[in-house]
C-alpha cells in the first residue's frame, strides 16, 4: 500500500473513531445509571515520567459526576485535552466502573458500538506500528504530522464491557515485562535504529550513532547462543477484579479507564458490589511468593537488555 493510501486510511479510521465515541457517549447518557465510581490519579508532569513511583494518592468520584468524568475520559485523545505542564509521554488513567441498567435491545446496541470502537482502535494501532513500516523512533513524527497532538496510548486503549457482574473490586499491579530474545533479534533492532536517520532526544545525531554503534559492538561480542532477556519494569497499574456469582468465576482486567457494566436486574439485590481503590504505597507491598530469579547482567541499559549468567 502506498504512503498516501495509508495516510488516508489513518485519517478515515480516526474520524470514524471520534464519531463512534460520540455515539457511545449519547447511548450511555440515555441509559439509567445504577452506580458509578471512578478514581482520579495525579497527572504526571513533564520531565517526571521516568521517576520511580512510591506513592499514588487516589481521589474517588461517584454517581452522575463519575459517569460524566468517564465519558469525557474516553474521548481525551489529544495533548490539548490536558494541562500545559502534563506530560504527553504518559497516558492518562482513570480506573473505575460505570453500571447501567439495560434491556436486551439496549445491551445489543451498546455492545455493537463498543466492538466497533475497539476494532477502530486496533486498526489504528496496526496502521501506526506495523503498516507504516517505521521504527519506533520515527512513529512519533509520522503520527504528529497527520494527527497533531495525538496521545497514541489513549487512542489504542480499548473499552472493556462487563455483562451482569456480581462485584467489581480494585487494586494495584506492579510487575516486569520479561521477554526472551536472541542475539540476532537484538542486532536487527539496533541496526534498524541506526539506519532510521533520526536521533532520539536528548542525543544529537552524532551522539545517537555513537551510542547505537557501541551497543551493536557489545552485542556482537556475545556468543551466538547467549541467553538474553528484556526485563522492563512496568509502572504500577490499577487493576479490576470482577466476580461472576453464577459462573463462580473471577476475571482480572487492567483498568486504565473505566469499565462499563451492563446489568439486567431482576431485583435491587442483584446490583453489583463496587469496591474502592486505595492509595498506592510501594512500602506496603507484600509478595505472597517471589521465586528466586536467575542471575542477570545488565548489557544494554537503554533497552533493559540483560545477559543470563
From Swiss-Prot:
One of its GO terms (molecular function) is DNA binding. It comes from the Bacteria. It is found in: Cytoplasm. Its main location: cytoplasm. SUPFAM superfamilies: Replication terminator protein (Tus) (SSF56596). Coiled coil: none annotated. The keyword Cytoplasm applies. InterPro entries: DNA_replication_term_site-bd, Tus_dom1, Tus_sf. HAMAP family: Rep_term_Tus (MF_00483). Belongs to the Tus family. Trans-acting protein required for termination of DNA replication. Binds to DNA replication terminator sequences (terA to terF) to prevent the passage of replication forks. The termination efficiency will be affected by the affinity of this protein for the terminator sequence. This is DNA replication terminus site-binding protein. It comes from Yersinia enterocolitica serotype O:8 / biotype 1B (strain NCTC 13174 / 8081).
Amino acid at each position: 500500500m502506498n504512503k498516501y493510501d495509508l495516510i488516508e486510511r489513518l485519517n478515515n479510521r480516526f474520524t470514524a473513531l471520534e464519531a463512534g465515541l460520540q455515539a457511545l457517549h449519547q447511548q450511555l447518557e440515555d441509559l439509567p445509571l445504577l452506580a458509578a465510581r471512578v478514581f482520579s490519579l495525579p497527572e504526571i508532569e513533564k520531565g517526571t515520567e521516568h521517576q520511580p513511583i512510591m506513592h499514588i494518592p487516589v481521589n474517588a468520584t461517584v454517581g452522575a459526576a463519575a459517569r460524566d468524568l468517564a465519558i469525557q475520559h474516553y474521548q481525551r485523545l489529544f495533548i490539548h485535552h490536558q494541562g500545559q505542564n502534563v506530560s504527553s509521554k504518559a497516558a492518562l488513567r482513570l480506573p473505575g466502573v460505570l453500571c447501567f441498567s439495560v434491556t436486551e435491545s439496549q445491551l445489543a446496541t451498546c455492545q455493537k458500538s463498543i466492538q466497533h470502537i475497539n476494532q477502530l482502535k486496533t486498526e489504528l494501532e496496526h496502521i501506526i506500528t506495523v503498516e507504516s513500516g517505521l521504527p519506533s523512533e520515527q512513529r512519533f513524527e509520522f503520527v504528529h504530522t497527520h494527527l497533531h497532538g495525538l496521545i497514541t496510548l489513549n487512542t489504542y486503549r480499548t473499552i472493556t464491557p462487563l455483562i451482569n457482574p456480581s462485584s467489581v473490586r480494585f487494586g494495584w499491579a506492579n510487575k516486569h515485562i520479561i521477554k526472551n530474545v536472541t542475539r540476532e533479534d537484538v542486532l536487527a533492532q539496533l541496526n534498524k535504529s541506526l539506519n532510521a536517520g533520526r536521533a532520539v532526544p536528548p542525543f544529537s545525531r552524532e551522539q545517537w550513532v555513537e551510542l547505537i554503534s557501541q551497543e551493536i559492538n557489545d552485542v556482537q561480542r556475545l556468543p551466538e547462543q547467549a541467553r538474553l532477556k528484556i526485563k522492563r519494569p512496568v509502572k504500577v497499574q490499577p487493576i479490576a477484579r470482577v466476580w461472576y456469582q453464577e459462573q463462580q468465576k473471577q476475571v482480572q482486567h487492567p483498568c486504565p479507564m473505566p469499565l462499563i457494566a451492563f446489568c439486567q436486574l431482576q431485583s435491587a439485590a442483584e446490583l453489583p458490589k463496587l469496591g474502592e481503590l486505595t492509595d498506592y504505597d510501594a512500602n506496603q507491598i507484600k509478595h505472597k511468593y517471589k521465586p528466586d530469579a536467575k542471575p542477570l547482567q545488565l548489557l544494554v541499559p537503554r533497552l533493559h537488555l540483560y545477559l543470563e549468567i
